[in-house]
Amino acid sequence: GGQIGAQATSQWYLDLWAYAFNTGDTEDFMKVCQVEGYCDEFAHDLERMHTDAYLVKPLTNQYLQTKDIYECSLKKDGTEGICIKFTYLQTPAGFRYLTEEKASEQYDTISTVTGEEINNEQRFFRVLFLEERGDTWVVTHIWDH
């Protein structure tokens, strides 16, 4: 519970996201991802991508630093939770597509890189909103910066 539990969940979320991306196995990820309109779509996109292509170089996420952690609430409905601002480093995955047609497929929640970009690490800044559900934390909103 508390902020320590929420922070651990945010790091776990990032690890599960990478695992799901690399393997197509979203079962554990879906237990902590409860973002309406994103989590189910992400799982569907990954299922399609892993059907259309095969992984040749796994994506990596490295949690760098928690910038801030504080109690917060959603203005829309007053839901209370904990907000976590953090940075992480990502190295993109490499996929080979089964056909040229499949290589041009578009996905709503994931993007792929080609050629030289595959070795470019990128630093990201995210804010997660976590809600306590029973004795566990779940991510219900994500803001990219």
Residue ranges and their predicted role:
Residues L14, A20, M30, L55, ...:
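Compositionally biased, intrinsically disordered low-complexity regions enriched in proline and serine
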Residues C33-E36, L46, Y63, D68, ...:
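A mature extracytoplasmic/lumenal domain signature
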Residues D40-D45, T60-L64, Y107-T109, E117-N119:
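A short linear-motif detector with a strong N-terminal bias
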Residues T51-D77:
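A contiguous pocket-lining binding segment that forms or flanks enzyme active sites
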Residues E71-H145:
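Exposed beta-sheet edge and beta->alpha loop/turn motif
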